[in-house]
Each structure stands twice: as C-alpha cells, then as structure tokens.
C-alpha cells in the first residue's frame, strides 16, 4: 500500500491526533486500520499496553526469542503470533497485525527499504510476529501523576538514541541498546522512576538519568529516531530502554525480509497497562470486545 498523501509531509495530523487522544481504543484502532491515522501513538489508547513489533520468517524466530529472553529490559516480550497467522489473538481478539499499526518499516537484507501503512501485500505464510512492550504504556501513569511530557503535549515522537551499551547476542541478533528520553523535573525524577518501575512489560524503571555521556550519547539535539525535545532548566534527561533495540539487532541479522513498526508508531493491544501477564484468554478477549463495542472485518 503506498504511503498516504496526508502522511508524507508532517509528523502527525494535529487535528486527528488531538481528537483521537480522547477517543476509546476501538475508535483509535479503527482509524489506524482504515489508514486515516498514520502517525505516532504516544498518548493514544490510554490504559492499554502499547507494543513494538518485529515480524520475520519462522527460520529466525527461535533465535530472536532467545535474544528477547537475554535482553528483557529493551525487549520485554509480550506476544508471539502463530506461524503465518496475522491475528495476534493473545493480545486482542480483533488485532490484525497487517493493518493495525500506523506505519511499518520494511527491511531487506538488513537495510531499510521503505515504510508503508499496510502489510497485507507483504504477508508470508512463514511469518512470525513478536510484540514487545513499549514505554508509551506508562506515560499515562506519569501524566496522571502530574508529570508533563513535552512530546505528547506538542504532538511529537519521543526521541530515541543508540547508546553505547551492548546487548547480549543470540544467533545472528546483536547490537547496541536503544534508549528513549523524556525530560523530567529534577524534583520528580525519583517519582518517575518508581512509577515506571510498576510497568515491567513496558521497560520498567529507567536505565540512566542525568549526563547523556554516561550512555555514550554526545548530542541530545540529534536523536537517531524521533524528534528532538527541549530539556528546560530544572529538568533532567531520563533514559529508558527502548523497543527500537530489536530493529538494530534485525539490521545485524541481515534477513532477506523483516518488518517492524516505524519507531513511535505502535501496536495498541487490548491488554491493560498494569497487567502482570500479557495474555488474553478467549473469555478475556470476548469481554474486551464487548467493552469496546468493536467491530472488525477480516480483510479477506
């Protein structure tokens, strides 16, 4: 599917984004599925686990699962699809991972080949999809505590940086940890640490705060992904492990094809943000669908 014209030149459609911030998850997902919204998901689907996405041929899946197990901080595994099945049933009975992410990155032989908003035409019978929890999940809790987040207030994508921290390799997967940054008032850093610690499926507590040089980051104004954000006087840069880390590992693996979310453009699941176990049983899926009043077509 070609990149929609209304998504080509802007970070986000401000009017649509501001509207969706106050809509229930069912309406947010419907807008994404219809191609009406193709920007970042920070601040959307409040109360539900957001997830990074990695899709690859089954031949690589076991090594990738090992990579996630060995690196739980940047790669908190929250869902794995059945081979060839695009319905991520344990994360929501109505989730179709081919259409329910605002934007996808396509990698061929380890190189970014382009971005699309729909991967139905690229889907393969041997694909396995992995969902990895995202720090967008705990942002709702930070906001509820009165901690403002500049990127959400200004419709920007959170900045992400390649750190100098090595991950533990598994098979062909290896690389540096990616971190996301949020500027937090100095007198509230300890509170932000404790709040985010309650969300282990969304990277949990930060890995570092203060001088970015401690992570090998030389210039906060030049993130590797996302948008630069200011660090006002009296604020401290706080860094969390980030689910873009697997994209670095996927580049190193040089698979013939793999697909990820575009950084900042997440899969929003039906799993409550504070769930201890990221699995929806069949009866839970029915309850979730009823509560959301959601309808779905199978894209046949």
Swiss-Prot record:
Keyword entries, A-Z: Lyase
Pfam assignment, any one: D-Glu_cyclase
InterPro entries referenced in this protein's UniProt entry, alphabetically: D-Glu_cyclase, Putative_hydro-lyase, UPF0317
Molecular function terms from GO: lyase activity
Signal peptide: none
EC number(s) reported in the record: 4.2.1.-
Family per record: Belongs to the D-glutamate cyclase family.
NCBIfam families listed in its UniProt record: PRK05463.1
Protein name in UniProt: Putative hydro-lyase Dshi_3152
Species assigned in the record: Dinoroseobacter shibae (strain DSM 16493 / NCIMB 14021 / DFL 12)
Organism classification: Bacteria, Pseudomonadati, Pseudomonadota, Alphaproteobacteria, Rhodobacterales
């Amino acid at each position: 599917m070609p990149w929609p014209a209304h998504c080509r030149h802007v970070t986000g459609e401000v009017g649509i984004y501001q509207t969706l911030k106050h809509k229930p998850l069912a309406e947010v997902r419907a807008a994404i599925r219809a191609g009406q919204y193709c920007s970042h998901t920070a601040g959307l689907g409040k109360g539900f686990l957001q997830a990074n996405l990695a899709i690859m041929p089954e031949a690589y899946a076991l090594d990738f699962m090992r990579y996630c197990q060995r690196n739980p901080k940047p790669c908190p595994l929250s869902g794995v699809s059945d081979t060839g099945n695009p319905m991520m049933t344990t994360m929501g009975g109505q989730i179709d991972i081919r259409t329910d992410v605002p934007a996808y990155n396509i990698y061929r032989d380890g190189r970014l080949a382009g971005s699309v908003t729909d991967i139905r035409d690229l889907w393969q019978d041997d694909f396995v999809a992995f969902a990895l929890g995202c720090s967008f999940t705990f942002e709702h809790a930070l906001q509820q505590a009165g901690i403002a987040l500049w990127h959400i207030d200004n419709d920007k994508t959170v900045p992400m940086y390649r750190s100098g921290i090595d991950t533990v390799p598994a098979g062909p997967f290896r690389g540096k940890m990616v971190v996301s940054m949020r500027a937090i008032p100095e007198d509230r850093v300890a509170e932000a640490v404790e709040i985010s610690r309650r969300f282990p499926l969304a990277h949990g507590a930060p890995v570092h705060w203060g001088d970015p040089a401690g992570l090998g980051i030389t210039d906060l104004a030049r993130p590797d992904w996302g948008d630069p954000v200011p660090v006002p006087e009296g604020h401290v840069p706080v860094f969390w492990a980030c689910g873009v880390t697997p994209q670095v590992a996927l580049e190193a693996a040089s698979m013939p094809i793999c697909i990820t979310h575009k950084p900042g453009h997440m899969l929003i699941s039906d799993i409550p943000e504070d769930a201890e176990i990221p699995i929806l049983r069949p009866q839970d899926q029915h309850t979730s669908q009823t509560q959301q009043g959601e309808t779905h077509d199978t894209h046949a």
